[in-house]
Amino acid sequence: MKKSITTLDLNLLLCLQLLMQERSVTKAAKRMNVTPSAVSKSLAKLRAWFDDPLFVNSPLGLSPTPLMVSMEQNLAEWMQMSNLLLDKPHHQTPRGLKFELAAESPLMMIMLNALSKQIYQRYPQATIKLRNWDYDSLDAITRGEVDIGFSGRESHPRSRELLSSLPLAIDYEVLFSDVPCVWLRKDHPALHEKWDLDTFLRYPHISICWEQSDTWALDNVLQELGRERTIAMSLPEFEQSLFMAAQPDNLLLATAPRYCQYYNQLHQLPLVALPLPFDESQQKKLEVPFTLLWHKRNSHNPKIVWLRDTIKNLYASMA
């Protein structure tokens, strides 16, 4: 017999949603500010109402049953509609609203002014906190310290930064893909030589220390070819490497995403971009999908959904 919703405590659906997001009674209890015992009792009521276990224990936490998986999207949509309904009586620009982002620089800097204008237009009292993407950023998203991350991942099969290696709790959307190129000053002697792998490796390189590593997919590809570049300088950000590569009489080469042309135009750096001297299959391994990342619990959060859409529209021209 079909059950009536009037026989169900709707607060239990919030508990169910949080259990689906967190896959943990303890974590769901923490978010609800109740004890794990209270969440366990709520889960027991839900199991009785749906006549299904809903979750089973596994080494990775609570694993949803087929029925629970089938309800996930509908439950999320119901929660989003509920949030929108409850938000109606409130002012659309609440005081104290914060937007916290972790982003690769200069990726965010080229659109930061436009993004901040749109945020303040919609939420005049909002504050924006921007931090550089680093080794702790994914954990910061999980901890709830960051609303959205915006960073490049890697495509090399041996990379630790593959999209498929992201934690299960992280959702993402690729906004555009980029293949890095070599940046060198306009009067660099390499511009008077045949541009090939030997020329590329003849000069000293600037490396970016990315998530506590000085090497990345480029070095993996070189290793496969039995070659190695000379890293003369290691810096934390791409814009610093571009600045150093642009200095007069500097022989250093910087390898950075092609999107950096926007940054160079803004700052009028005297740099020339050359393609990495690899064949098509090797270039494919160097492709960088630039990706928005957020925690699954925020997938239907109206503020986060709006922020994601706004960033996506700003970077649409780079796709």
From Swiss-Prot:
GO molecular function: DNA binding; DNA-binding transcription factor activity
HTH lysR-type domain segment(s): 8-65
InterPro entries found in the cross-reference section: LysR-type_TF, LysR_subst-bd, Tscrpt_reg_HTH_LysR, Tscrpt_reg_YidZ, WH-like_DNA-bd_sf, WH_DNA-bd_sf, YidZ_PBP2
Lineage top rank: taxon: Bacteria
S-S bridge residues: none
Portion annotated as DNA-binding: 25-44
N-terminal signal peptide: none
Keywords per UniProt: DNA-binding, Transcription, Transcription regulation
Family that this chain belongs to: Belongs to the LysR transcriptional regulatory family.
Protein's job: Involved in anaerobic NO protection.
Protein name: HTH-type transcriptional regulator YidZ
Species the sequence originates in: Escherichia coli O157:H7
